[in-house]
Amino acid sequence: MPTTCLNFTKKCGGCPLLAMPYREQLAQKQARLQELLGGFAPVKAVQGMADPLHYRNKAIASFAAQHGKLVCGLYAEGTHKVLPGADCLLQEDILNKTLAAVLDAARTCRWTAYDEDRGTGLLRHTVLRSSADGKVLVTLVTPGPELPGSKNFCAAMRKKAPWVVSIVQNINPTRTSAVLGNREKTLYGPGFVLDMLCGTQFAISSRSFYQVNRTQTEVLYKKALELAKLTGRETVVDAYCGIGTIGLCAAPQAKQVIGVERNPAAVKDAA
């Protein structure tokens, strides 16, 4: 696999296996599966991707102040040192473009980065979610509800990144490594992005669990449904269902689907 990422040599914590040939990565996964499951049943070959790059539909970046300037990016491995955002080889291209627009707009608003040691500053993280048709949900994580200039930020984003369909402020006052808090305010748009998976449309919000590899998720779900051999008479229980991707994809082939989930935000998205 290519190692042209500018941050790879700086020990970015995002993809430590980038330098390993993809076939070797698959071989290691195969060996691990054989070790874990081989004693119970035959383990078939791992089905890899045709192009294992730019597949992630979710990006999380942290903000920091470096040399008096606001930056954002991933942490260096094993640290909380932010590596300013180079174009990530795993994220969808639209997310790299959106991240650059978020940083530019935040600088225009003269927002400051949150300092986790002092507990001061405004921006902690940004979380981006993208759809198959190139639409993006932007979430800004702040330590408190104050976000002065948020209207100017939204206006700037609509100009710089017109593919952004919604902007949400997530409030996380805890001094922990958790990215998202439990409170949110929608600043622009519906508060979610719509995506298609196996022919079914899903609403994805910032706190919803959603598979980050859309391509391989469809491969996995279609194979699972093929092996399930549903006849239309079954009741399918989708335990820990999140926004219900498995159950809703199975619904056309089953009598009924029951989803079980404790996260209210995920249940709202599934509905």
Residue ranges and their predicted role:
Residues 149-271:
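Rossmann-like S-adenosyl-L-methionine
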Residues 1-185, 197, 226-233:
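SAM-dependent transferase fold signal centered on methyltransferase-like domains
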